[in-house]
Amino acid sequence: TEQMRKIFESLPLIDQDRLAGWKIPFLRDWLSHPERDKYWERTSMGDGYSKIRASAFSVGGWFDICLDGTLKNFMAMTAPSIDPAVRGGQRLLVGPWVHSISRDGKTGELDFGKGSAQDFRQLQFQWFDSRLKGLDSGIDSLAPVRIFVMGRNVWRGEREWPLARTQYRDFYLGSGGKANTRQGDGVLSAAASASDTPDRFIYDPRDPVISSDEGPYDQAAKELRPDILVYSTPPLEADLEVTGPVRAVIFAESSAPNTDFTVKLVDVYPDGRAMSLCDGIIRASFREPGKKPSNIEPGK
C-alpha cells in the first residue's frame, strides 16, 4: 500500500515501527547496536558448542534468510573438536525453500516439483522418537546431510557439509568499462580480464533497487537499470553444479564516505529469465570483519 511504501522509505530506520503504529523493542535494540558489542556477545555461541551434549536436526532452505546461521551451526556441531558421540548425532536438511517449507513444491517463481516438499511434522516425530524415546524410527537410516539439488530437482544424501569433494573455482569480473545493465559489456570468466578499466555507476538512495521477496525471482527487469553492473558467462556448454559456500571479492571506491554493495549470483535461462540463486550485501564501513567499522576515504 501507499502507506507502507512511505514507511519503508522513511528515515531513520529506528522510527519506522512507530510510523507503522507500534514499537518493536527488539528491532530498536538491534538498530541501536550496529557493531558487535556486549549486546551481541551475550547471545553468541562462541566456544559454547563444546558444551552441548544434545543432537540437533538443522533445517534450512537455499533461499532462507537464516541459512548462513543454520549451516555455520551444523559445521560447528560436527567439527573434529566435538565429542564423536555428539558429532555423529547431528543431521542437516536443506531444501528449495525460504524460511518456511513449501508444501506444493513452488518457491518464488519456480516450481521444483512435489518431490521437493517434505512432511516436516513426520520428520520431527521420527527425530524425537529416536532422540527422546530411544526408538528405531528410521531417521538414522537417512544420510546425515540431505540436500535438494535444484535444476535436477532431486534429493541427495551426503556425509558432510561442506562437501569434501567440492572443487572450488574462481571466476573473474571483466569489461571494457561499460558493464551497466544486462546489455553492457560485462563478462564473467575463468580467466582474469586483461582490462583494468573500471566500471562506474551512480547510486541514488532516493531511487534504490527494490529487493525481491525471498526465493528465486526473475532479475531481468532489474538488470536494465544503469545502476546495476552485470557480468555474464557465455552460455554454458555443460551442466555446472554450484553447491557450497559462494564468496565475492570486489575492489571498489566511492565518492561517498559510506555505502552498501550487493552481489547476486543469477542463473540465466535460455528464454532470458535471470533467476536469483543467492546474494550478499556489505556496508563499506564493515569491510574488515573483526575490526572497528570505519568510513572509506572518498576516491580510494
Predicted regions and their residues:
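Accessory cap/linker subdomain of secreted extracellular hydrolases
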Residues: 1-51
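C-terminal, loop-rich substrate-recognition/catalytic regions characterized by aromatic stacking residues
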Residues: 2-17, 102, 108-300
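Active-site-adjacent alpha-helix of alpha/beta-hydrolase-fold enzymes
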Residues: 32, 68-90
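Surface-exposed acidic, glycine-flexible loop patches that form ligand/cofactor-binding
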Residues: 45-51, 82-83, 135-139, 239-241
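Extracellular/periplasmic catalytic domains that process cell-envelope and extracellular macromolecules
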Residues: 50-52, 84-87, 162-165
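Short beta-strand/loop motif that positions the catalytic acidic residue
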Residues: 52, 58-60
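Acidic catalytic loop of the alpha/beta-hydrolase fold
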Residues: 63-67
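Catalytic histidine neighborhood in serine/cysteine hydrolases
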Residues: 80-106
